[in-house]
Amino acid sequence: MSRSVKKGPYIQEVLLKRINEMNKNGEKKVLKTWSRSSTIFPQMIGHTIAVHDGRKHVPVYITEDMVGHKLGEFVLTRTYRGHDDKSEKSSRLR
């Protein structure tokens, strides 16, 4: 279920403040954040934000296509190792 239109999009205030300061000064630093639920705003385009995945911070470069999505959508929290191949033992059980 999506967020109510009357409430508006959520973004961590500190994150938005730091992005606006960087835009004003013309800086391009990697910002660390734990706020996976923050919505990507147009001011963030061109910046790299390191989003926490539960173990480490994964850098995400923000492009125009990402605006309106959440930061957490672009960082996976689980490692998929694939399904086990059919072994001789499992095929013999049938």
Swiss-Prot record:
BP terms from Gene Ontology: ribosomal small subunit assembly; translation
UniProt KW keywords: Ribonucleoprotein, Ribosomal protein, RNA-binding, rRNA-binding
GO molecular function: rRNA binding; structural constituent of ribosome
Residue intervals passing through the bilayer: none
S-S bridge residues: none
One GO term describing the cellular component: small ribosomal subunit
Name of a matching Pfam family: Ribosomal_S19
Functional description taken from the UniProt entry: Protein S19 forms a complex with S13 that binds strongly to the 16S ribosomal RNA.
PANTHER family assigned: RIBOSOMAL PROTEIN S19P FAMILY MEMBER, SMALL RIBOSOMAL SUBUNIT PROTEIN US19M
Family listed: Belongs to the universal ribosomal protein uS19 family.
Name of the protein described by the UniProt record: Small ribosomal subunit protein uS19
Biological source species: Clostridium botulinum (strain Langeland / NCTC 10281 / Type F)
Organism placement in taxonomy: Bacteria, Bacillati, Bacillota, Clostridia, Eubacteriales
